[in-house]
């Protein structure tokens, strides 16, 4: 499993390669005696299934005093988790799906999912659909606030499958109404697939594209946050805790892959998409030959 300890900007943000090191050995972990039956608090839509760990879903307040608390960035922002870490210095906290760069604490780690790889894989899926529906003349779109890095990764994935496809970069305000309107505009310009980042903007984009009976994707379709949560829980059971750093989880770790797909995608294309995800996890670039 490949992990990197890195400095990242925002949830799954750009990793500063100059400061990236391999995570084993990881920088300055806290080591204690390994424990069986370790209490691990779980906040948000996460599931921890690790031998020797007793995971207990709850709130930040209810998890106070647990040896390790893993928190989904979907349910609590970094500031709230940092405040809990300050209030309970003997507990360790990990926020899943966000960097801790702006709130470093010795007992707080950020578990960053590699959004660039998720966007690339989304592009591969969009490319497979485009090849099936329109070939070199097909159009697909990235919709939402201007995120050039992620839109670029998406485009690279598309062009891996269909080099001549047109990738529309349909920027909009981070507002559901604006995202839906922009999505409908992209479909009107011929997009057969629309991909968005996440949150209410992505949900509005998916609503819009489905109204037109087209395919919609978002980053979370290609992310497995439970993999990151299980990793730090497994380390905690072994007596090792992380803090003051980010751990980046990519396809090789199992955190990036095909989590779910739009039901409008055919079983044959879904199989090709999963093959492409396996190629990415093994360190190979997904290719048109994956089908």
PLM feature spans:
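Extracellular mucin-like PTS domains
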Residues: 20-30
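Hinge/cleft segment of the Venus flytrap/periplasmic-binding protein
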Residues: 236-291
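Hydrophobic alpha-helical segments within soluble ligand-binding/sensing domains
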Residues: 111-136, 224-241
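Flexible loop/hinge segments that line or gate small-molecule binding clefts
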Residues: 89-112, 222
